[in-house]
């Protein structure tokens, strides 16, 4: 099924707008001006609808390409704050020791249940041989409880060691900062649904920018753009 059927604008224009919005810290109105300079007259509200429709689809179609690396680098997990409808929500994130994105999960709560769902999501998306020996988190007890439950359920190998070494999480703290600079242009989100849809696009573009799918670019400087276009042809 063609996801662009019935759209007034061409697929490449829509994907260009979604990709740039999710990649750079620009607003919908700024992107509207950029498109107008290129002869594309589209309202910022239309660009918003494009992002809500196609950013999650882009993350879904590209996940196989930027999926969790298989070199067993330790995972580092932490959460950061995102403003949603005037309140703080919690974006759970994991990167490996080389800074590559492992996964993410947006929650309205910061507790053991949210940590369990986040860790469960990661484990559902990887093979058991891709799970590292060490997982590092902060001192929050929620991660320890979640890991213990997942081990009892047989979803997490029993020999995975949970570490809580603060300085080792500098890698994800740094990655939070880069992500927040992009999210900062949004001035908050109206709902959890719109926030998560947008964040999915931002996270996948961050993963591509880190080079996590560069093996499919074949040294092409425009490889990222072509890869995004290619997955929507399938």
Predicted regions and their residues:
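Basic, short loop/linker segments at the boundary and entry of helix-turn-helix/winged-helix-like folds
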Residues: 1-23, 39-43, 48, 66, ...
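Mobile genetic element proteins and their domesticated derivatives, centered on retroelements
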Residues: 17, 31, 47, 77-78, ...
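C-terminal domain-tail junction helix/linker
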Residues: 197-234
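Short, basic alpha-helical nucleic acid-contact segments in DNA-binding proteins
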Residues: 49-70, 153-154
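Helix-centered, glycine/charged polyanion-binding patches within enzymatic domains
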Residues: 139-203, 207
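Short conserved beta-strand segments at catalytic cores or DNA/RNA-binding microdomains
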Residues: 85-101, 111, 119-123
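DNA-recognition alpha helix
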Residues: 27-40
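Active-site beta-loop-alpha junctions of metal-dependent nucleic acid enzymes
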Residues: 53, 104-128
